[in-house]
A protein has these predicted regions:
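Short, hydrophobic/π-rich interface segment
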Residues: 138-196
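C-terminal edge-of-domain segments
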Residues: 198-208
Length: 210
C-alpha cells in the first residue's frame, strides 16, 4: 500500500491525538510521549508498505490503516499496555472532534435505502477472499424491522495484529464499534461474539434507538 493518500492523511489527522492520549490515559510524560510518536512514525510507514492495496469498492481500508497506526504506537511504547487501558487509549485517540462529527453525519444516513444497499454490496464483495487484510461479511436485516447486523467471518485487523505479535490486544480495537455507534447517536450497538475472543464470527448489530 502506498503511504501517500489515506495513510498519510490519517497520520496527519490522528497522530497528535495518539500522542496526547499517551500522557492522558497511559501516564507517560510529555517527552516520552514525543519519543514514542517519533519512533511510531517509521514503524507505521513500514507496516503500511507491506500491506496490499485495497480494491476501490472495499470500504474497510480505513480500518486497516487505523490498526497499523495503533499497532505502530504499541510497538514503540517502552511497556506493553493491558487490554483495558489500551481500549480506553484507542477510543480516546480516535474520537477527535472531526471523528465525532463524522460519526454523527454517518448516523443521519443509517438505515436509509442507500445505507442498506451499501451493506449488501459489501457483503457481496467478499474482499477477504482476495486480500487477507480485508473483511468478509454477511448481512442480516432483523425481521422485526429494528435494525440490521453485519456478521464478519474474516477480519483484517485479526490478521495484522497476529502478524505484529499483538493479537491478545485485539479486543481493545473491537471495542471501538461501541464507541462509534454511541457517537452516531441513532443506534444501540449489540454484539454476541468476536473472532478475536475465539467466537465463530464477529457480529456487529445496529438497533434503532427509541
Amino acid at each position: 500500500m502506498k503511504y501517500a493518500g489515506m495513510p498519510f492523511g490519517l497520520w496527519m489527522l490522528f497522530a497528535g491525538s495518539f500522542q496526547k492520549q499517551l500522557t492522558a490515559v497511559l501516564g507517560y510524560d510529555a517527552a516520552t510521549a514525543r519519543a514514542i510518536t517519533k519512533k511510531a512514525k517509521p514503524q507505521y510507514r513500514q507496516i503500511i508498505r507491506r500491506l496490499p492495496e485495497f480494491e476501490k469498492a472495499d470500504r474497510f481500508k480505513m480500518n486497516i490503516v487505523n490498526c497499523a497506526m495503533v499497532g505502530a504506537f504499541i510497538l514503540s511504547m517502552p511497556q506493553r499496555p493491558e487490554v483495558d487501558s489500551l481500549t480506553d487509549y484507542y477510543a480516546r485517540s480516535m474520537m477527535t472532534k472531526p471523528m465525532q462529527w463524522f460519526c454523527r453525519k454517518s448516523g443521519k444516513s443509517k438505515f436509509t435505502a442507500k445505507d442498506i444497499a451499501a451493506m449488501k454490496a459489501t457483503a457481496a464483495l467478499k474482499a477477504a477472499d482476495r486480500n487477507p487484510y480485508s473483511w468478509n461479511m454477511e448481512f442480516y436485516e432483523y425481521p422485526d424491522g429494528s435494525g440490521y447486523e453485519g456478521r464478519f467471518t474474516k477480519c483484517g485487523i485479526c490478521v495484522l495484529m497476529k502478524e505484529l505479535g499483538l493479537y491478545d490486544l485485539t479486543p481493545a480495537l473491537c471495542h471501538l464499534d461501541y464507541t462509534m455507534s454511541e457517537a452516531g447517536g441513532v443506534t444501540n450497538f449489540v454484539r454476541q461474539y468476536t473472532l478475536a475472543s475465539g467466537g465463530p464470527y464477529c457480529d456487529c448489530g445496529y438497533k434503532k434507538k427509541g
